[in-house]
Amino acid sequence: MTRSSSDRAIVVPAAQNALFTDSPFPTPESRLIAGVDEAGRGPLAGPVAVAAVVFDPAKPRINGLDDSKQLSAERREQLYARIVDRALAWSVVLIDSEEIDRINIYQATMLGMRRAVEGVAHVAGFARIDGNRVPKGLPCPAEALIGGDALDRAIMAASIVAKVTRDRLMRELHAQHPQYRFDLHKGYSTPAHLAALQTHGPCPQHRRSFAPVRRALGLETAQTAWDVPCAPADGLLLAE
């Protein structure tokens, strides 16, 4: 595992072996595809996680892949183990709450996507990203696919890897800050989480650019992360 102090990104190295993708969206020259997806854009606490997964068409498929949001936590864990064991390459990037507050959640997600693709660029010739935006500066050609986590198997796998990685971390953070019950809501804005914020105030894992956290801090103006002035994220903007 490598860490970059400049962007607080954690990249998990690739596993070996492979699985199969039958994506209906072909890429030029049959290049290996990196599916890319994120988990944790909306929560009030914790990092945003971005994963990239590369499939090998010569290997058997993993059955049961789906958008991580459609799977139970137990099923996600089962599929995660299969993905990381048999993937040709995979990577996970975590951008923490401090960096999210510095550059905003959108730019943090774009940064995570770029770092995740860089983590599999030694095998991937093309990246397919869930959503409608492609970050600038990717190491290979890419396209955005709206609803890709329900359409493309590589993106489904990435969504599972990102979600499981982040959920595991939030359970670890619960041990450090049990008063917020991060193990239950994973940092999302549930009534119990909002009540804990009002009672205890925010901890270092909370995103201070998000309106409910700002209100808990007693700030008069509650701004969302998108309203907060931000520094450029390593030159990251949208690809033209």
Curated annotation (Swiss-Prot):
- Which domain of life does the protein's organism represent? Bacteria
Q: Which UniProt keywords apply?
A: Cytoplasm, Endonuclease, Hydrolase, Manganese, Metal-binding, Nuclease
Q: Which organism is it from?
A: Xanthomonas campestris pv. campestris (strain ATCC 33913 / DSM 3586 / NCPPB 528 / LMG 568 / P 25)
The cofactor(s) it depends on are: Mn(2+); Mg(2+)
SUPFAM superfamilies assigned to the protein according to its UniProt record, in alphabetical order:
Ribonuclease H-like
Location in the cell: Cytoplasm
List GO molecular-function terms, semicolon-separated.
Answer: manganese ion binding; RNA binding; RNA-DNA hybrid ribonuclease activity
Please name every pair of cysteines joined by a disulfide bond in this record. Answer: none
**UniProt key word Metal-binding:** yes
Quote the PANTHER family the UniProt record gives.
RIBONUCLEASE H2 SUBUNIT A (PTHR10954), RIBONUCLEASE HII (PTHR10954:SF18)
Q: What's one Pfam family here?
A: RNase_HII
For this chain, the family text in UniProt reads:
Belongs to the RNase HII family.
- Which function does this protein serve? Endonuclease that specifically degrades the RNA of RNA-DNA hybrids.
User: Binding residues for a divalent metal cation, per the UniProt record?
Assistant: 37-38, 130
Name this protein carries in UniProt: Ribonuclease HII
**One GO BP:** DNA replication, removal of RNA primer
Q: What is its main location?
A: cytoplasm
The record describes how the cofactor is bound as: Manganese or magnesium. Binds 1 divalent metal ion per monomer in the absence of substrate. May bind a second metal ion after substrate binding.
Top EC class, one word: hydrolase
Q: Which reaction does it catalyse?
A: Endonucleolytic cleavage to 5'-phosphomonoester
The protein's matches in NCBIfam families, at most eight in alphabetical order, are given as: PRK00015.1-3
Gene name tied to this protein = rnhB
Give the record's GO CC terms: cytoplasm; ribonuclease H2 complex
What InterPro entries does the annotation carry?
Answer: RNase_HII, RNase_HII/HIII, RNase_HII/HIII_dom, RNaseH-like_sf, RNaseH_sf
| PROSITE patterns the record matches | RNASE_H_2
Q: What is its EC number?
A: 3.1.26.4
**RNase H type-2 domain ranges (all copies):** 31-222
